[in-house]
Amino acid sequence: MAILVTGAAGLIGRAAVAALLRQDVEHVRAVVWDPAQVAGLRRLGAKVALLDATDPDGLAAAMDGVFTACSLTGSLWSRPGEDPYAAVVEPARVFLAAAGAAGVRRVVVCSPAAVGTAAGSGPPANPHLAAKAEVERMIAASGLEHAILRCTHVLGPGSRLLDLLAARPPVEVPGDGRQRVAPVWVGDVAAAIAAADDTVELAATWSLSGPDEVSVDALVDAVHGGPVAKHHLAAAAGLTHAQAEVLAADSLADPALAWPPGLVPTPLAETLAATGTLARR
């Protein structure tokens, strides 16, 4: 069986491609728009399609013969001024249309854990979360087998959040630093994507988080290997309002949702060690 991954050059995408190849998936097709990312993915063993995620004909052609298609576009880290609908919902609409045209059986998407928290009181007010909630609705209504992976903050090599928290003190912290988080290792998210491809007759929303719940202030200290000075701000430098709002809120597992069967979450200490953050201090 073949599996296709859009957003394959991103934090989760690259880890997912590597995890799927380790699982001996027959063909892993990685979709990227940046020519500079092609060589690295090919070295991993993936077949690479260079096209824009909003190109319906190109995506449908790339999906030919694919059983599972995984959409990893539309992350929180969009460019300043970018419309969340254009960055998140439109690529998902094109992705689902292409999947239907190509006869794809199953789709997998990642969504922020905060989508579930915000949805408890109606549609999310945060534009990024609202866009992700709309994508979840589209996936559920598509008639395709699917897995929606609601992830807490994802940490891994090259994580934008990790770079923010690892900045030279005093560290700019969105919010008051007391918000509770349970960061998940990017390798665990990749393993969940691989599990979703390998599960029979799937239609599920899974909750992905790390096993350790800490305050953001404690996470900053853990990243630095000890207590450091912090500035608590409504919006840290370089963040959009939507990004700062998400980071200033809790990011925890949804107790009403199951963790992917058979997977064991990675402890926070192991996650930070694997990112090499402490080695860079």
Where are these regions (language model features)?
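Oxidoreductase cofactor-interface core, primarily capturing Rossmann-like NAD(P)-dependent enzymes
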Residues: Q23, T117-V223
